[in-house]
């Protein structure tokens, strides 16, 4: 057996004498004072660290943001905006956001979104509604299409920042040479192209984005609008891809190739391939986005081109496919008020003017299209306003990415001749209906 022995500890405490008592009293006061000074100096630094608001963005635009980020951080010492630079491919940025949300709490407080991401992200519950943070009067300052593109089921999930819209570029000098006005209809576009080519003034009449990618869906949205057709009615879920108007829209694009108005390789062209053809003087007409204007203004066709809304059938109107970017707030963020502070900063007119002057992007605020500073540098902005005020949205449905993939595949089949327009559009409509039912 084990034996335990108690150990007694005796401590003798003697009353301090007056000298030692005074010493310890002063020593204790000195220690307390020192600790107090340390707490006053250190605790605020610990408890008042800046709150970090993180956002993922394409690398190119992230670099362009750097002056604004620096200004924001200097202006808000208790906040720190941190930009994570992702790939320049927008689809890959969307994938990174999606992966972050699917894995749980997203590391991003702000969500910088393409307009076609909004419904998918909102339907999944990944975004916080902004409806209680902004009034309708404040939203009236923005292009209506950009605001509507940020809504899902009646609530606002994206605050517009910059916009985009498809349009028709045309050579003013070539049209002047044949004594013609710019085209208003599809038929006039074909006739003028043919005339210019027959007179050997230009190799190709009209170039557009025919590659199988998102740009094909965007371009086709405008042609479809011009024929009076529709893709998906977001309210009723009706699909219009197999209707006569949609088939006629596909046939028009096929005709531009078969009649030699567009080059055979147009079915492999994205924005840049078509821009270079037009900018190098090899095409009379071009469908593209606003970014082309600044680049073409520094080329051999400077001063020899203009822009207008897309052509259309006489009995129907024109529509510019709406693009653009804006801000949402992650539903899982612990810093939602701070994220809104960032959005408010980027919404200030003086901040936007500074940014657009440097980058050439197009504002989403209507008043900025006539701002003297911006117009002095980008004289086309007032004309561009006429284009983007007549927008056509890609279908604002939660399954947009899958619907676009379906359309791209079957459009490509029709344009390359592996299926007839009727066959391709019927199949596209059937797959889209099945998708929406799921």
Please identify what each model-predicted range represents.
Residues 2, 24, 30, 49, ...:
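Conserved C-terminal helix/tail region of periplasmic/extracytoplasmic solute-binding proteins
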Residues 48, 303, 308, 357-409, ...:
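Long, aromatic- and glycine/proline-rich binding clefts that accommodate carbohydrate-like moieties
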Residues 71, 75-142, 149-151, 173, ...:
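Extracytoplasmic "Venus flytrap"/periplasmic binding protein-like
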Residues 74-75, 80-85, 98, 156, ...:
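Extracytoplasmic/periplasmic substrate-recognition and gating elements
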Residues 99, 106-109, 137-174, 204, ...:
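A structural signal for short loop-to-beta-strand junctions that line the ligand-binding cleft
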Residues 113-165, 181, 190, 216-221, ...:
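Hinge/lid segment of periplasmic solute-binding proteins
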Residues 153, 157-161, 166, 190-239, ...:
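Extracytoplasmic/periplasmic solute-binding protein
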Residues 192-195, 199, 235-267, 310:
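Glycine-centered hinge/linker elements that transmit conformational signals in sensory
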């Amino acid at each position: 057996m084990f034996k335990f022995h108690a150990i007694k500890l005796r401590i003798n405490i003697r009353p301090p004498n007056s000298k030692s008592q005074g010493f310890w009293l002063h020593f204790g006061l000195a220690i307390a004072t020192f600790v107090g000074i340390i707490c006053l100096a250190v605790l605020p630094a610990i408890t008042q660290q800046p709150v970090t608001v993180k956002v993922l963005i394409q690398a190119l635009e992230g670099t362009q943001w750097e002056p604004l980020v620096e200004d924001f951080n200097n202006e808000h010492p208790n906040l720190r905006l941190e930009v994570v630079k992702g790939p320049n491919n927008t689809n890959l940025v969307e994938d990174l956001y999606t992966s972050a949300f699917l894995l749980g709490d997203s590391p991003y407080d702000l969500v910088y979104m393409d307009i076609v991401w909004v419904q998918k992200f909102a339907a999944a519950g990944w975004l916080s509604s902004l409806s209680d943070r902004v009034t309708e009067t404040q939203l009236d300052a923005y292009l209506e299409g950009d605001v509507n593109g940020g809504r899902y089921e009646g609530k606002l999930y994206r605050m517009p920042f910059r916009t985009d819209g498809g349009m028709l570029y045309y050579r003013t000098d070539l049209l002047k040479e044949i004594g013609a006005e710019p085209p208003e209809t599809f038929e006039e576009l074909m006739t003028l192209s043919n005339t210019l080519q027959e007179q050997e003034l230009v190799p190709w009449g009209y170039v557009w984005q025919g590659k199988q990618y998102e740009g094909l869906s965007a371009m086709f949205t405008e042609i479809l609008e011009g024929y009076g057709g529709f893709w998906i009615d977001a309210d009723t879920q009706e699909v219009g891809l197999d209707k006569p108007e949609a088939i006629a829209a596909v046939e028009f694009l096929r005709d531009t190739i078969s009649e030699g108005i567009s080059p055979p390789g147009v079915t492999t062209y994205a924005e840049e391939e078509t821009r270079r053809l037009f900018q190098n003087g090899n095409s009379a007409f071009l469908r593209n986005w606003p970014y082309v204007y600044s680049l073409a203004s520094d080329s051999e066709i400077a001063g020899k081109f203009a822009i207008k809304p897309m052509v259309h059938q006489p009995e129907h109107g024109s529509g510019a496919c709406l693009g653009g970017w804006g801000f949402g707030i992650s539903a899982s963020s612990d810093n939602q008020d701070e994220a809104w502070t960032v959005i408010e900063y980027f919404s200030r007119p003086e901040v936007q003017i500074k940014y657009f002057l440097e980058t050439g992007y197009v504002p989403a605020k209507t008043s900025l299209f006539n701002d003297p500073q911006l117009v002095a540098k980008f004289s086309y902005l007032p004309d561009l306003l006429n284009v983007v005020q007549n927008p056509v949205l890609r279908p604002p449905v939660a399954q947009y990415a899958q619907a676009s993939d379906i359309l791209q595949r079957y459009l490509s089949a029709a344009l390359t001749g592996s299926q007839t327009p009727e066959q391709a559009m019927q199949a596209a409509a059937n797959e889209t209906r099945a998708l929406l039912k799921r």
